[in-house]
Amino acid sequence: MKKSNFSNVNLSMGTGRRKSSVARVYIREGSGNIKVNNRDFDSYIQLENLRTMALSPLVLTNTLGKYDLYINVYGGGISGQSGAIRHGISRALFKLDESNKMILRSNGFLTRDSRKVERKKFGQKKARKSFQFSKR
């Protein structure tokens, strides 16, 4: 795992993915400011349950308020983006301090959630749903 030095400040980067969303998370020591796509975290993710889900790695490792986060996220909807942010924060925290590995791994935050939307098949209405069958 590689740490990069950015203007004499220790900076850690993690990439998170979920559904079709990709989040690049940059962490450095600071006062707890969180920016997502140059917007405030609370204004970008407005649903409370998605906010708590995205910040759960910081709460779990007792580092909420100790680091500044700059997050660049694109693709998908707000739920997939929140999951990608959580995955990216977990990876960046692991790169910053490897003692976090056991906590994050046991809660499944370092594992990529591989579930994606199943494609629609021809001859069917949706991915699994068939057209109505008429016997006569």
From Swiss-Prot:
It comes from the Bacteria. GO terms for biological process: translation. GO terms for molecular function: RNA binding; structural constituent of ribosome. PROSITE patterns: RIBOSOMAL_S9 (PS00360). The keyword Ribosomal protein applies. InterPro entries: Ribosomal_Su5_D2-typ_SF, Ribosomal_uS9, Ribosomal_uS9_bac/plastid, Ribosomal_uS9_CS, Ribsml_uS5_D2-typ_fold_subgr. One of its GO terms (cellular component) is cytosolic small ribosomal subunit. Keywords: Ribonucleoprotein, Ribosomal protein. Belongs to the universal ribosomal protein uS9 family. This is Small ribosomal subunit protein uS9. It comes from Borreliella burgdorferi (strain ATCC 35210 / DSM 4680 / CIP 102532 / B31). The lineage of its organism: Bacteria, Pseudomonadati, Spirochaetota, Spirochaetia, Spirochaetales. The gene is rpsI.
